[in-house]
């Protein structure tokens, strides 16, 4: 089983062409729904009493929501604005609300999960919750600038507790205080994790494992509407694919990254979660074949 832990949110996203207000979002939401095309994930998250029923139904359609807690108060909210090129996002407002006092725990039915993804979340909570699983075969985490700047030591401690780290290029540099991505990855692996995947947005990603470097290009798109959740969709597809195969060989991890690139490309083609919610498995397989043709020579 795969368990995803992190945030479920109500997002306000402002792009040059459209503004979405209070739509379903959150790192764990994107990651878990992306993973759901490969396996049935369990979600550990919290929402408030204002969380719309229609969004709860969406989560229930794709995920096991036994670990979704409902607390009195408002749901975690995020408000962000993209520049005209959709390459820079400015955070306008973050309201933790119920997420700020949520005390997460792993439901009994999730404790035997052999795959665990710790989506962008408080590193202290992540490090604590990974210990509540009985026997994890493969664990992975993500982090962002906010946690690196406010809890860097805890981020490093979290990295020691997982098998793989997924992080974007600028945050890898910020975390390690290095300018070269190879040096970044080596330093992160030196902290105890086995695999490092550095996301480079539209330019794909780099996988590092021991002395191996595996670069993968992003899937080329003519139209991008909303980059929100692309990195979370990438990571969710990665661990969802691995959980479906129940294998973590380096060859399977490479394949999982291809699926990650593909799922990230679907996420950015529409606004919010629509790129994922409109998907069929046949769409994914078709794009993977297109990707294979694109990179073959």
Where in the sequence are the language-model features?
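Conserved N-terminal subdomain of the carbohydrate kinase-like
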Residues: 10-22, 37-118, 130-136, 285-297
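A short acidic, amphipathic alpha-helical/loop segment
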Residues: 55, 125-132, 153-157, 183
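Conserved phosphate-binding/catalytic region of the ribokinase-like
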Residues: 181-297
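Conserved phosphate/ATP/ADP-binding segment of small-molecule kinases
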Residues: 137, 145-215
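Alpha-helix C-terminal capping segments
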Residues: 30-41, 241-245
């Amino acid at each position: 089983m795969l368990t995803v832990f992190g945030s479920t949110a109500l997002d306000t996203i402002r792009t040059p062409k459209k503004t979405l207000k209070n739509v379903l979002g959150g790192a764990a939401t994107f990651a878990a729904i992306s993973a759901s095309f490969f396996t049935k994930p369990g979600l550990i998250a919290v929402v408030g009493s204002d969380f719309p029923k229609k969004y709860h139904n969406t989560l229930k359609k794709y995920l096991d929501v036994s670990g979704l807690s409902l607390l009195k108060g408002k749901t975690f909210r995020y408000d962000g604005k993209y520049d005209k090129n959709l390459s820079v996002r400015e955070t306008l407002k973050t309201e933790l609300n119920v997420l700020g006092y949520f005390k997460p725990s792993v439901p009994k039915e999730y404790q035997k999960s052999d795959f665990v993804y710790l989506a962008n979340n408080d590193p202290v909570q992540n490090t604590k919750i990974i210990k509540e699983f009985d026997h994890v075969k493969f664990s992975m985490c993500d982090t962002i600038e906010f946690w690196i700047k406010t809890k860097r030591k805890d981020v490093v401690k979290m990295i020691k507790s997982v098998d793989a780290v997924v992080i974007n290029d600028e945050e890898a540099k910020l975390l390690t205080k290095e300018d070269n991505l190879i040096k970044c990855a080596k330093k992160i692996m030196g902290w105890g994790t086995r695999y490092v995947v550095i996301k480079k947005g539209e330019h794909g990603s780099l996988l590092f494992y021991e002395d191996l470097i595996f670069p993968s290009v992003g899937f080329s798109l003519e139209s991008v509407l909303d980059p929100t959740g692309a990195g979370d969709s990438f990571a969710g597809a990665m661990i969802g694919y691995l959980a479906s195969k129940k294998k973590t060989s380096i060859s399977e991890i490479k394949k999982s990254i291809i699926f990650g690139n593909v799922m990230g490309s679907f996420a950015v083609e529409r606004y919010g979660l629509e790129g994922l919610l409109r998907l069929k498995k046949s769409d994914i397989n078709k794009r993977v074949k297109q990707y294979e043709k694109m990179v073959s020579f």
